[in-house]
Structure formats: structure tokens, C-alpha cells
């Protein structure tokens, strides 16, 4: 693959690449990762905001932060992001696939272009980025495992022995971490956000599948399935936001990101970050679909709200 990197290239800085990092939850991921000392790659389709966020991260946290414009709904964008990191020598040790958008409307009222946008960002971009950076992480893992095995053999271990195999075994997350933002909607085909729900179900299934593929190579994959998050993605009046928080339906992005990162650094496969969301997951598995038809009649659901990537 283009841009494969040796594990011990000392001229490379380690970075966390975050999509949708110019605002909302992505910005919070960038801030909390920077607070942990990670250099940040700010990727979104908001060029000026990318630059502002990168500069603010440098000033506040003393880390390196670099902006990159990418419209992730375009099929070539993921490759462009990857090629940029290779060209600049940025070693991506953490990939956070966070970019997203939301449309509340019945299917017949959603423009085809908007459908393509949601599917492109949530499904294709996530899959392509994980393929590119996951493969790169695995190449480094193979090199590191081989190096440790050879060192063990040089120290007296027999080739193929348990001691040699143990030496080459990689720890969880040692060679890279991937975090994929899914949603509680992945567990329930949700009326008026049918495309969103379907794409988030893809994210959840995809994340679980590549968790299996990559875990033996010291690469952790964590899929996050929150309920509603208090970001501009959801267009609610302040009074309704307050009610949603009081009912435990909505979570602040700072709280969600803190829980998601804790799960990622512990190598968790799936994280459902609130008690109410965990209970909802259980109900979703047994709830007859005709019981959720009332959702389409909630006034706020009738409003067409969307946010750029």
C-alpha cells in the first residue's frame, strides 16, 4: 500500500486524526485528545474553522495541530486525507471517525443528493479511512512483532517456541486505536431518520467486524453508540434541550467524549455511554416495530434539521 511506514521512523510525529473536528463533538474530541498530549489532525469541510481550531489547540495545549480540508462525502476525499498524512510524515496512531450529519424528515422528502451525502460520510468515508489507516497500522504492527520475535530468538528462544511467540504478541491498542461514532439509532430503525439509522447500523456492524480483524495486531477498534448528544446537529429550542437533559435523553458532548475515550484507551469494542441508553438497547431488541410509529408524530421530528460535516 502507498505510504507504508516503518515502525521506528523517528522523524515522524504521532498524531490523532479526527474527522468533523471543526465543531461539535469532533471539536470536543480534539480538545480532550490534545489535553492528553496528542498532536491533532483537524479534518472537516470547513476550511476556515479548521485553521481556527488548529491554532487554538496549539495555543491552549502546546501540541502540534494541522488542518486539512476534506469533503468526506466525495469518494476520493479519504485517499486525499491519507496521502496528505504520508506526504507530511504524520504518523496516525489514533483515528477518530466522527464526521456526521442528520436530517429529520420522511424519506420521500429527502433530496437524493442529501441521501448520498449522509451515506458517503457515514459509510464510505468511515470504511475507506479505516481501510487506509488500519492497514498502515497493521504494517507497523507486523514489523514490530517480527522485530521482537527476532530479538527473542537472538537471545536464545527457539524459532516457533512459545517464548518466541509470546515475544511477538502485541498488546491491545499498542499499534493503533480506531474510534467509530455510531448511535443508539443503530439498534432501532427510527422513523424520520431512516437513512441516518441505517448508516449508523452499518457503522456499528463494520466496527465490530474490523475489531475482530485487527485485535491480534495490537489495534483496538471502539464503536460508540450514544443517545442524543447536545450539539448543533440537533436543532432543539433551549427549553427542550433542558428537558431532554433532565430526562436523561440527551448527554453533553464533554461527558460523552470523556466516556468514549476512556473506553477506547481500555480497548473496549462497544460503548453505550449512559444508563438510559443501555436500557433502551435492551428494549430495542424486543420492541415490536408498530410500537414506534408514534415517533414520526413528535413535533420536533417533523422539522427538517441538518448540519454540515
Positions of predicted regions on the chain:
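Conserved glycine-rich Rossmann-like NAD(P)H-binding loop of the short-chain dehydrogenase/reductase
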Residues: 36-52
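Active-site helix of classical SDR
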Residues: 130, 199
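Residue(s) in the substrate-gating loop at a strand-loop-helix junction
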Residues: 183
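The beta1-alpha1 cofactor-binding region of Rossmann-like NAD(H)/NADP(H)-dependent oxidoreductases
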Residues: 69-80, 112
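SDR active-site lid
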Residues: 27, 212-276
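Conserved glycine-rich cofactor-binding loop
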Residues: 15, 22-23
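Substrate-binding pocket helix/loop in short-chain dehydrogenase/reductase
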Residues: 106-107, 111-119
Amino acid at each position: 500500500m502507498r505510504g507504508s511506514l516503518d515502525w521506528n521512523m523517528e522523524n515522524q510525529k504521532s498524531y490523532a486524526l479526527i474527522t468533523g473536528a471543526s465543531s461539535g463533538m469532533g471539536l470536543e474530541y480534539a480538545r480532550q485528545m490534545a489535553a492528553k498530549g496528542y498532536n491533532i489532525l483537524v479534518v472537516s469541510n470547513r476550511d476556515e474553522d479548521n485553521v481556527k481550531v488548529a491554532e487554538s489547540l496549539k495555543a491552549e495545549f502546546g501540541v502540534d495541530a494541522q488542518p486539512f480540508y476534506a469533503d468526506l462525502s466525495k469518494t476520493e476525499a479519504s485517499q486525499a486525507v491519507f496521502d496528505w498524512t504520508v506526504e507530511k510524515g504524520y504518523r496516525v496512531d489514533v483515528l477518530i471517525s466522527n464526521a456526521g450529519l442528520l436530517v429529520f424528515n420522511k424519506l420521500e422528502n429527502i433530496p437524493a443528493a442529501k441521501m448520498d451525502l449522509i451515506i458517503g460520510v457515514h459509510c464510505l468515508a468511515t470504511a475507506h479511512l479505516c481501510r487506509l489507516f488500519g492497514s498502515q497500522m497493521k504494517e507497523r504492527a507486523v514489523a514490530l512483532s517480527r522485530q521482537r520475535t527476532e530479538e527473542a530468538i537472538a537471545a536464545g528462544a527457539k524459532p516457533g517456541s512459545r517464548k518466541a511467540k509470546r515475544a511477538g504478541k502485541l498488546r491491545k491498542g499498542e499499534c493503533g486505536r480506531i474510534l467509530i461514532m455510531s448511535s443508539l439509532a443503530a439498534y432501532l430503525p427510527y422513523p424520520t431518520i431512516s437513512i441516518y439509522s441505517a448508516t449508523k447500523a452499518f457503522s456499528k456492524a463494520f466496527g465490530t467486524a474490523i475489531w475482530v480483524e485487527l485485535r491480534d495486531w495490537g489495534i483496538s477498534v471502539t464503536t460508540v453508540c450514544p443517545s442524543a448528544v447536545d450539539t448543533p446537529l440537533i436543532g432543539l429550542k433551549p427549553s427542550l434541550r433542558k428537558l431532554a437533559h433532565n430526562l436523561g435523553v440527551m448527554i453533553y458532548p464533554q461527558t460523552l467524549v470523556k466516556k468514549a475515550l476512556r473506553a477506547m484507551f481500555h480497548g473496549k469494542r462497544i460503548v453505550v455511554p449512559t444508563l438510559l441508553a443501555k436500557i433502551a438497547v435492551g428494549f430495542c431488541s424486543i420492541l415490536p416495530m408498530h410500537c414506534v410509529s408514534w415517533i414520526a408524530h413528535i413535533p420536533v421530528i417533523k422539522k427538517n434539521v441538518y448540519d454540515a460535516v
